[in-house]
């Protein structure tokens, strides 16, 4: 459903942000 898509996008966003923070 729409909520699952939102959850997936949020998870991916957190992963990307965490990756950027780790690169600093």
UniProtKB/Swiss-Prot annotation:
Transmembrane portions of the chain: none
GO (cellular component) term, any one: extracellular region
Tissue: Expressed by the skin glands.
Keyword field: Amphibian defense peptide, Antibiotic, Antimicrobial, Secreted
UniProt GO BP: defense response to Gram-negative bacterium
Subcellular localization(s) per the UniProt record: Secreted
UniProt entry tagged with the keyword Transferase: no
Range of residues in the leader sequence: none
Family, similarity comment: Belongs to the ascaphin family.
Free-text function comment from the UniProt entry: Antimicrobial peptide that shows higher potency against Gram-negative bacteria than against Gram-positive bacteria. Has a very week hemolytic activity.
Protein name stated in the entry: Ascaphin-2
Organism field: Ascaphus truei
